[in-house]
């Protein structure tokens, strides 16, 4: 049985870790390297750093930050945000990131998935998907932080990303993100059954039980969360204890 992974997510803006709902009303929650070290000590399996800076200056700061993270933590980490080309991905991987996460740019130009996978290998490529459920019940892809609907249906796009060389899918339900109301379990159960590659669940964790649920009933390979870890509402150790109690394999 593959070990289930717990992945804290750190949104970074102008070099600081921030947290808000739907990328708005952002609050500063600390230094990204210090926070990453804290989570590594707590037992995090991996980290995800998402650069939500809107400026080129912020992007440059992020590359320098990736070098600091690579020097400062001893667990794998993925970086994303603003990666629009192979050159962007190369810059961050060369700075020390273990994987890159691509989102809106992959929707706009799906060949980007293949370009990065062919250069570095699929294990370096995470395709992040921000999906939103429409009033008719269907799930569609959104871009630009969930603000723009596309005409791409979720399951078709996830399958295309897999075929183009994605090593993992990071799926966020924009309906649930930041609400702490739990993950949409039927959505993840369907997607994980549909794909060969690992699925990381994101968007909605409010307690350890929500994470346990998406990794068991939802079939996800990993769970990503931010608020509940940043604000100390639960710890990674508590989540892993709850998983172990359910007979789920976790890294100690």
Predicted regions and their residues:
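Alpha-helix-loop-beta-strand connector modules within alpha/beta enzyme cores
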Residues: 57-78, 114-130, 181-201, 205-206, ...
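Catalytic cores of alpha/beta
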Residues: 77-78, 83-96, 186-223
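Conserved anion-binding
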Residues: 12-14, 18, 98-171, 175-176
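Glycine-rich, proline-tolerant flexible connector loops at the mouths of alpha/beta enzymes
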Residues: 46-64, 104, 170-181
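Structural preference for beta-strand elements that scaffold enzyme active sites
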Residues: 5-9, 46, 74-78, 99-101, ...
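Glycine/small-residue-rich loop that forms an oxyanion/phosphate-binding "nest" at active or ligand-binding sites
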Residues: 53, 62-120
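C-terminal helical cap(s) of enzyme catalytic domains, especially alpha/beta-barrels
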Residues: 113-120, 213-252
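Conserved, mostly hydrophobic/aromatic
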Residues: 11, 39, 47, 79, ...
């Amino acid at each position: 049985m593959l070990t289930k992974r717990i992945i804290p997510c750190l949104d970074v803006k102008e070099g600081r870790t921030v947290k808000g709902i739907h990328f708005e009303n952002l609050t500063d929650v600390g230094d990204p390297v210090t926070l990453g070290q804290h989570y590594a000590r707590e037992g995090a399996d991996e980290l995800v750093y998402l650069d939500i800076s809107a400026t080129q200056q912020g992007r440059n700061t992020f590359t320098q930050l990736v070098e600091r993270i690579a020097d400062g933590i001893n667990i794998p980490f993925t970086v994303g945000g603003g990666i629009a080309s192979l050159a962007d991905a190369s810059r961050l991987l060369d700075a020390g990131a273990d994987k890159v996460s691509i989102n809106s740019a992959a929707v706009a130009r799906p060949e980007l998935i293949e370009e990065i996978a062919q250069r570095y290998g699929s294990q370096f490529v995470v395709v992040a998907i921000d999906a939103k459920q429409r009033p008719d019940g269907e799930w569609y892809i959104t871009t630009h932080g969930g603000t723009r609907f596309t005409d791409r249906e979720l399951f078709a796009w996830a399958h295309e990303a897999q075929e183009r060389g994605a090593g993992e899918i990071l799926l966020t339900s924009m309906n649930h993100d930041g609400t702490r109301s739990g993950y949409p379990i039927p959505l993840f159960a369907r997607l994980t059954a549909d794909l060969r590659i690992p699925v990381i669940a994101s968007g909605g964790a409010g307690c350890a039980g929500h994470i346990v649920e998406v990794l068991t009933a939802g079939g996800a390979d990993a769970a990503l969360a931010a608020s509940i870890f940043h604000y100390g509402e639960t710890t990674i150790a508590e989540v892993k204890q709850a998983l172990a109690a359910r007979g789920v394999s976790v890294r100690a």
